[in-house]
Amino acid sequence: DRIHQAGAYAGVQFGLGTPMSPQTQVNDYTNEEIKAIVKDCGAAARRLKEPGFDCVEMKGATTDVLNQFLSRSRNFREDEYGAQNNENRVRLFKEIIEEIRTQCGPDFTILTLINAVEECDSALGDNEGYIVLEEAKYLAQQLEQAGADLIQVRVGTPGQEISCWAPDCNHTGIHMDGATGFGTQFNYASHFGGAQDGRHSGAGAFIPLAREIKQVVSLPVGCAGYMDPRT
C-alpha cells in the first residue's frame, strides 16, 4: 500500500532453482519436479496478488535455471524439456506463464526477462550452443503467445553476471573484482553478434536488441540494465 501511495506499482522478480548450483542442475530435475515448479510459481504469484502486488517478472536470463532450459550449451535433457528444438527449450517458460495467468487472472501483469544474445566470456570464440538473436526472437514470440505482457532483454555472459546488466564492465580487466574475460579493449562490433551499441552505457547499449525483438512481437519491449542519464 505504501508503494501505491507513492504512485508506483509493486512487483517481484521470480528466479528458479535452489541456492547456487552447478550448471548441470537443469539436467537433474525429474518431470515431477518440473511440474511442481510450474504449480509453485503460479501459487507464489497468486499469494503476491492477493495482498495487492501488481506484477511478477519471470527471470529467464543470465545463467539461472530457467535460462539453462533455454540454452543448448547447458540443457542436455532428452525429454520434452530438452534442447533438441526451440519448442522444447521454451516449454517450461511457457508453462509457468500460463500457470500464473490461470491462477492470477487476466488483470495481473506478467513480465519476462531474457538474454537476447549470449557469448562465452571464459573461452572467447567458443559460442557453440549459446543463444543468438534469431532464437531470442522465437522465444519472445512464444512468450507473447503464452500470455506475457512485457519482455525485457539484455545480453548473457555465463562467466560473470555483472556485465549482463552493466555492459560497461566489459571494459574492466580480468582478475579484477566483477571483471569478465573480455579484457580491457572491448570491441562491441566483435562480440554478441555486434548487437550492442557501444556509444551508450547501461541499458542504452541494449536498445538495438530491444528493437530487433520488437519487430516480431506486439508487446512492449524494454532493456534491463542500469540507467545512465548521459545516454
Which residue ranges define each predicted feature?
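Flavin-dependent oxidoreductase catalytic cores
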Residues: 1-231
